[in-house]
From Swiss-Prot:
GO terms for biological process: queuosine biosynthetic process. Zn(2+) binds at residues 187, 195, 198, 201. Belongs to the QueC family. Pfam families: QueC. InterPro entries: QueC, Rossmann-like_a/b/a_fold. The lineage of its organism: Bacteria, Pseudomonadati, Campylobacterota, Epsilonproteobacteria, Campylobacterales. This is 7-cyano-7-deazaguanine synthase. It comes from the Bacteria. The keyword Ligase applies. PANTHER family: 7-CYANO-7-DEAZAGUANINE SYNTHASE (PTHR42914:SF1). Its EC number is 6.3.4.20. It is an enzyme of class 6 (ligase). Pathway: Purine metabolism; 7-cyano-7-deazaguanine biosynthesis.
């Protein structure tokens, strides 16, 4: 059976990717990262619950807390305020420098070890916070680098099925494919109730609104 490493944060985008990988006939190896982000425990809980729901047998949780040591972002540095003034065209302070590059590189090492043919990652370029490492051009370039820098008998494809979708499209697709969107967590700041104001919450809520769907996770009143 063909195999895919799925980078899973516990959010709705990466969860949908895992569902799509399974539907495409891949045996999913679920990969989650702890980097001392504010909602680390809540994201890990979501990851575990989602894997159980999807019947994922092999799941790996890696400590990459060196990302927090590098710093420079509001997700790992609690002295910085997470911006809550709405989504803008500027790169927000929640951007973790080259995070996806780090994650994909580690996923590639795991894929080579596992003999996986694909890496799934839920990057979204069209309707997102404008993170530079979510661009389709970046993904294509790092995919080329991976295949140049790994064994001659290994080759894998980075699959980004959501990259050109809107958040509304992602919500609709999740509901269509019975992705467990109600188990996912998107908030950058809170672990008990989503704040509803950070970029990630705003994008999520707007996606549900445009899809005429109800988000079942708890939000602060």
């Amino acid at each position: 059976m063909k195999k895919a490493v799925c980078i899973m944060s516990g959010g709705m985008d990466s969860t949908l990717c895992a569902v799509m990988a399974k539907r495409a006939g891949y045996d999913v190896v679920a990969l989650h990262f702890d980097y001392n982000q504010r909602t680390m425990k809540r994201e890990k809980r979501a990851f575990d619950e989602i894997c159980e729901r999807l019947g994922v047998v092999k799941k790996i949780n890696l400590d990459v807390s060196f990302i927090a040591q590098i710093g420079g972002n509001a997700l790992t540095d609690t002295s910085m305020q997470i911006r809550k003034d709405g989504v803008s065209n500027d790169v927000p302070n929640t951007y973790v420098p080259f995070r996806n590059g780090v994650f994909i590189s580690i996923a590639a090492a795991l894929a080579e070890k596992e003999g996986a043919q694909a890496i799934y990652i839920g990057v979204v370029e069209e309707d997102s916070s404008g993170y530079p490492d979510c661009k389709e051009s970046f993904i294509k370039s790092i995919n080329e680098a991976i295949n140049l820098g790994t064994s001659a008998d290994f080759s894998c494809e980075i699959i980004t099925p959501l990259v050109n979708l809107s958040k509304a499209d992602i919500v609709s697709k999740s509901l269509e494919l019975n992705s467990p969107i109600e188990l996912t967590w998107s908030c950058y700041e809170s672990e008990d109730e989503a704040c509803g104001l950070c970029d990630s919450c705003r994008l999520r809520l707007n996606g549900f609104k445009k899809a005429n769907a109800v988000d079942k996770i708890p939000y602060k009143k």
